[in-house]
Amino acid sequence: MNHQIHIHDSDIAFPCAPGQSVLDAALQAGIELPYSCRKGSCGNCASTLLDGNIASFNGMAVRNELCASEQVLLCGCTAASDIRIHPSSFRRLDPEARKRFTAKVYSNTLAAPDVSLLRLRLPVGKRAKFEAGQYLLIHLDDGESRSYSMANPPHESDGITLHVRHVPGGRFSTIVQQLKSGDTLDIELPFGSIALKPDDARPLICVAGGTGFAPIKSVLDDLAKRKVQRDITLIWGARNPSGLYLPSAIDKWRKVWPQFRYIAAITDLGDMPADAHAGRVDDALRTHFGNLHDHVVHCCGSPALVQSVRTAASDMGLLAQDFHADVFATGPTGHH
């Protein structure tokens, strides 16, 4: 039988079916809660459980080390009774906001030896409405789907740009290397919760690993379009310089924000530019910053990268609510 999920201090309630995660039930009901990886890694969907009982969803952990004692991961649990939750935020979704399109490949080039820069065009007269930092689903012929962040800003709405890393054996990684101009893809968007507030004037530190740069590019291009004046630092990590594949974007932001700061973090010490940081992105954060109490950190990358940056930022005084993560996980339900 279905159980009811009640959101604390609101009139919102929605059903959770047997075998359905609380997060999926909320999204199905048109209620957006914070989330990213949907695999129990990022901790974004952690919510206080006030009343009721939960059970594991598909064998996933209902808590991880990022959860406070009374918190549960909404992606990893299902309702075993009626429950009441207190998420960090929530909002009603516009039922007309999410659209499914047949998009055409406009161009497909290599931005790096293992990264495809895939540009898609929408049908004539159609526009992709999304917010900076959100992602889309690519529906594959076998019924599976893969998620990728939009790298273009929302005002460039006649098409979509994706940065696709080639994962050995990856389902879409194999497909993308064969795509040519005129081929079509079945896409659906937008997905993902929005954490950054455009009117927040505090210093912003963006940390990316590899193609975690894609959503950050969308965010920074959007801030530039809005003429937001803010102290912004980008720490972008890769094994070698070829992984930092879009220097033109860095050059543009330096012109928009004279105070813009860029730190390249390279882990392959045998191929090190003179001005790069030798080491991981969390090392770069600790080296180049002091107290982060009045900062905002937006981090995009693998679960391990996000966790290492979260730990470093917390050690440096960043408040938990000022750390925003977009976790890239592989597989059918992971966000790439």
Curated annotation (Swiss-Prot):
Q: What does this protein do?
A: Component of the terephthalate 1,2-dioxygenase multicomponent enzyme system which catalyzes the dioxygenation of terephthalate (TER/TPA) to 1,2-dihydroxy-3,5-cyclohexadiene-1,4-dicarboxylic acid (DCD). TphA1 probably reduces TphA2A3. It can also use 2,5-dicarboxypyridine (PDC) and 1,4-napthalenedicarboxylic acid (NDC) as substrates, and preferentially uses NADPH which is the physiological electron donor.
Provide the species name.
Answer: Comamonas sp
Q: Which GO terms describe its biological process?
A: phthalate metabolic process
Q: Which PANTHER family match?
A: NADH OXIDOREDUCTASE HCR (PTHR47354), PROTEIN RFBI (PTHR47354:SF5)
Note the InterPro entries from the entry. 2Fe-2S_ferredoxin-like_sf, 2Fe-2S_ferredoxin-type, 2Fe2S_fd_BS, Beta-grasp_dom_sf, Cbr1-like_FAD-bd_dom, FAD-bd_FR_type, FNR_nucleotide-bd, MRET
Q: How is the cofactor bound?
A: Binds 1 FAD per subunit. Binds 1 [2Fe-2S] cluster per subunit.
- Which residues does the annotation say bind [2Fe-2S] cluster? C37, C42, C45, C75
pH dependence comment: Optimum pH is 7. About 20% of maximum TPADO activity is observed at pH 9, whereas no activity is observed at pH 5.
Q: Outline the extent of the 2Fe-2S ferredoxin-type domain.
A: 3-91
Xref: Pfam families: FAD_binding_6, Fer2, NAD_binding_1
Q: Which residues form a coiled coil?
A: none
Q: Which UniProt keywords apply?
A: 2Fe-2S, Dioxygenase, Iron, Iron-sulfur, Metal-binding, NAD, Oxidoreductase
Please state the gene responsible for encoding this protein.
tphA1II
Q: Give the reactions, separated by semicolons, that this protein catalyses.
A: terephthalate + NADH + O2 + H(+) = (3S,4R)-3,4-dihydroxycyclohexa-1,5-diene-1,4-dicarboxylate + NAD(+)
UniProt temperature dependence: Optimum temperature is 30 degrees Celsius. Approximately 60% of maximum TPADO activity is observed at 15 degrees Celsius, and activity is completely lost at 50 degrees Celsius.
Name this protein carries in UniProt:
Terephthalate 1,2-dioxygenase, reductase component 2
**What quaternary structure, including any partners, is listed in this protein's UniProt entry?**
Monomer. Part of a multicomponent enzyme system composed of a reductase (TphA1I or TphA1II) and a two-subunit oxygenase component (TphA2I or TphA2II and TphA3I or TphA3II).
Q: What cofactors does this protein use?
A: FAD; [2Fe-2S] cluster
| Class of the enzyme per the UniProt entry, highest EC level | oxidoreductase
